[in-house]
Amino acid sequence: MSKKRLYEIAKEVGVESKVIVAKAQELGLSVKSHSSSVEEADANRITSSLKPGTAKDESKPAPKATPTPKEEKVEPKVDKASVAKSAPAKETSKAEVKEASVALKKPKSRNFKAEREARAKAEAERRKNGGGRDNRNRNQQGNDQGKRHNNDRRNQKGNGQGDHNKGNRDNSTNHDRNFQGKLRNDQNQNNRRDNARNNQAGPRIDLKARAAALKAEQNAEYSRQSETRFREEKAAEQRRAKEQEKARKEKQQVKVAVQKAAAETKPAPKPAPVAPQSAPTAQVQDTRRKKVRPNKSRDNRRVNEDGPKQTRNNKWNNQNQVRNQRNSNWNKNKNKKGKNNRGNSAPKPVTERKFHELPKEFEYTEGMTVAEIAKRIKREPAEIVKKLFMMGVMATQNQSLDGDTIELLMVDYGIEATKKEEVDNADIERFFVDEDYLNKDAMVERAPVVTIMGHVDHGKTTLLDTLRNSRVATGEAGGITQHIGAYQIEEGGKKITFLDTPGHAAFTSMRARGASVTDITVLIVAADDGVMPQTIEAINHSKAAGVPIIVAINKIDKPDANPERVIGELAEHGVISTAWGGDSEFVEISAKFGQNIEELLETILLVAEVEELKADPTVRAIGTVIEARLDKGKGAVATLLVQQGTLNVQDPIVVGNTFGRVRAMTNDLGRRIKTAGPSAPVSITGLNEAPMAGDHFAVYEDEKAARAAGEERAKRALMKQRQQTHRVSLDNLFDTLKAGEMKTVNVIIKADVQGSVEALAASLLKIDVEGVRVNVVHSAVGAINESDITLAEASDAVVIGFNVRPTPQARQQAETDEVEIRLHSIIYKVIEEIEDAMKGMLDPEFEEKIIGEAVIRETFKVSKVGTIGGFMVTNGKITRDSSARVIRDGVVIFDGKLASLKHYKDDVKEVGNAQEGGLTIENYNDIKVDDVIEAYIMEEIKR
């Protein structure tokens, strides 16, 4: 036989599992929990032993009726009221009653009017068809059995009496319909067969009632837990109240003891005899306690700390009802104003001010206010204001004081005052001059920084090309270096950093900048050219920077090379060879063929070893900007030379007047690196703007400090630029007036790197054309954009692009606005073009040229024409478009133009030498015989 678990039996019967377990234990079965198994016979015993009413209505078998042919048992049609009256009283537990009440649902409202109309219509139809009573009974019996089948699902959704009534209502409706004969006999037979099958099935489980029972059980458990939790919270609140009361009493005792001790120290007069105040005090305290609203509990009982619960007065319930009706935040405990409630609030204790000792030292800053000083020395501002008034200084607590006043005030208090040295966070130069910034114990040897200088086309880039084994020289426009480059090579296990500077005269500032950051200068002089102007300039820069010079005499492979002449010329400028007793090393090389290059590198390392070059790689990096430019995809790109410390990716950095974070870092070979030590040239991205070449940079501790320093430096630079106003004085008054009369060529300069921008602007400003000057409206790094064209159109300027190109939008806008764009890659061409433009803007200058002379031989006066002078040309020629002067006795009488010129009777353009003719002069008729006519023209002078 199969076994059943107890919870399965409970589900079938429709009761809780614990009831089945208890019943099984009463019957003597060995079970422990609802998961225990029993035999089928024991399961039937448990089911049959349950009390009536425990199982659901669906599990009860229907009473059997006497079978009749073609008829089944018919349940009588009953009403809800009759069922409620005739139903036997069942013994149910409290939980089951609660479950039934929870599961009870309100039946849906019926449309009685529609039912009456349907019944009347069906009755009329039945009478018309002549249906008999037997047919009606059969239909009713079939429908009574079918209604249970058709409404089985509907009955299962209900619970308890409500579902039973609902099924009865539906059954009565179906009965009314089938009573009219609307269901066929075959449908009735099917209904009877289904009902018979359902009656033979086992007991059903009412899931709705079961769910309601579980819900009721959960609600009961939650109510018990809530009650327990509420009581625990109430007990905790009472404990806290007791502790607070105890602490208050202890504090009161301490206060009384302190007052008593203070009274004992002072001799007090004899107190008058007074009545004991203990009883009235207790009475007052009791009165106050009565006025306080008692603690509330959830069951509307008054809770006393030392006694049982008491029933609450109806007064509080009425107040709660009024409060709920008002729906307001009414608070009964709110203190009412008035003399009757003055005793409810305890008097505030008087706080005694703590005495603070004066500090021994006081560090002040210029401009501190009285309030700030009072806060620092723990004194009232009024006290300090009083002291200042006694010293003769009228001040308020928000007034700033100077350093002398603060020191006098501190002397009066007996405090030693010292002025605080303020550190300018925006000052980058302090890192370069502060000796304490570097750790002397962490100093290590660093690579030398070598700057290659010399005249243009003397072979500087070719030497670097040979050293780096690359074709840098062929990539330069016009064969000259346009901007500075930094490279690093390795020789004998040691690194050397090279800086390449341009040799053209326009790049003076770049050469000076290179000399300021270098350790050794390699001066290249061509053996066939000798010392040139830029060679002398490089010598002066190196001497000004105090940098040792190594002379590399290049192009010794040429037939006309003369190294001895170069050595002698350099000696005249203070560069003396060690062979001649000087301190400069000379090396004869051929950069083109790589001759003596190793000797040059060894000489550089030897001089570097003598110089003892060291750096501290442990500090935050500082250094100098070698070059800066704007890249279309990367933004601002700066080439930096790290001089001290180590530069890392993501370091917050301040460069010149801008700031940023090192986003990416590449070395001279274009490879990405994460760190760069001393003497390493790197290219970084991540700056907000392109800095100026030659600016110093420093790494800060965090991005916030770097941002503050960068913004402050930019602000100061802007203020400094605005302060550079030219004031008119007696000394420069003439120059100012002359400048107002001069013509101006406005230019906008855009270049690829910052060094080229500076060099180009300086070169254009040096162009000397009398009467014309160059005005650089704007200069920047990057491509020519629309804003440049707009500015050029507004200022009537020419846009010069050096190694850059305009964007398509800028080019289209320039064509529309008729703005001229000049693109160049060689600085010579730019200077020549601007110089020609400046000369073309001058007003033309004319020079007087005498072309002929004539003598008046006869005069003729003609009406409406004037005086006609007959002349003979004595020198040169007289032309029709020439001007004429009338000279009489060596004095110019009139200067004007010829009105007509004739040879005999014909109008001619000119009359040659020794020929005769006639002429008239505009607006002059006083021509006399022997007057000399001098003919001249004005010729333009070429500049």
Swiss-Prot record:
Region of interest called G3, as start-end residue ranges on this chain: 500-503
Domain tr-type G intervals: 445-614
Segments of this protein annotated with the region G1: 454-461
Low complexity composition bias: residue spans: 254-266, 313-332
GO-annotated cellular components: cytosol
Entry's localization field: Cytoplasm
UniProt name for this protein: Translation initiation factor IF-2
Superkingdom field: Bacteria
Region annotation (Disordered) ranges: 30-357
Matches recorded under PANTHER family: TR-TYPE G DOMAIN-CONTAINING PROTEIN, TRANSLATION INITIATION FACTOR IF-2-RELATED
General function of this protein: One of the essential components for the initiation of protein synthesis. Protects formylmethionyl-tRNA from spontaneous hydrolysis and promotes its binding to the 30S ribosomal subunits. Also involved in the hydrolysis of GTP during the formation of the 70S ribosomal complex.
Similarity comment text for this entry: Belongs to the TRAFAC class translation factor GTPase superfamily. Classic translation factor GTPase family. IF-2 subfamily.
Span list, region G5: 590-592
UniProt entry tagged with the keyword GTP-binding: yes
Organism of this sequence: Streptococcus thermophilus (strain ATCC BAA-250 / LMG 18311)
Organism taxonomic ancestry: Bacteria, Bacillati, Bacillota, Bacilli, Lactobacillales
Keywords on record: Cytoplasm, GTP-binding, Initiation factor, Nucleotide-binding, Protein biosynthesis
Residues that coordinate or bind GTP: 454-461, 500-504, 554-557
Nucleotide-binding among keywords: yes
MF terms in GO: GTP binding; GTPase activity; translation initiation factor activity
Region (G2): 479-483
